[in-house]
Amino acid sequence: MNKTLSLLLTTTALVSTPLMADTNKQEMVNQIQAQVSSWIDIQVTPQSSIIQKMVFNCEFYSATPYIKSPDGSESSSGSYRFYAHNGVLGSMTEPFTTQPLPELTMCLKEDFVVTNQDEAQLLFEAIETVYPNHSMFDENFPKEIIEKTNGWHFIDGEIFDDKKGYVVESTPEGKVTKIIRSLNL
């Protein structure tokens, strides 16, 4: 009987020790996650302007995560853009290369058309409020608006001797069907 009790206690001790160690590890992981999470701050800024209200039927936001180090310093790894359309929140495409910007096209007011230079200028300026060009290389670059057979080119800078900007495709009536960020205009 003593041997059985001794064997039972030994087996219980051997089986429960790793479980307690795993529980302690998970508790430490949870504590570390909670501490690091307390270092993160997210600043959300509404991006609103009169020109946006004239062109788009969405609200735009910028979210910037900041990491506060234990020594008190802060760092950020960039901002992210969001839109709200009919009560639905979505994230904006971040154009790092030539690519369509479907959220901008979707957010255009239903009756907005581009049929002349002034309306093209209005759209170009509205796009720049959503996607500001912060490149120091383009600060003094003269912006251009060029009418094409199926839309417009909005040029806002250069990259390796190629012009960059936006391609706006539209119907003959001026209804915008697609907005593309382009690095080779």
How should each PLM-predicted stretch be described?
Residues N2-L8:
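Sec-dependent signal peptide recognition
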Residues L9-L14:
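Hydrophobic helical h-region of N-terminal Sec-dependent signal peptides
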Residues S16-P18:
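N-terminal signal peptide c-region/cleavage motif recognized by signal peptidases
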Residues D22-N57, I67, T93-I146:
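Short, non-transmembrane alpha-helical segments in secretory-pathway proteins
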Residues A34-N86, E139-E169:
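Exposed beta-strand-loop-beta-strand "reactive/processing" segments of non-cytosolic proteins
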Residues G78-E110, D162-L185:
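A short, surface-exposed interaction/processing loop segment used at functional sites
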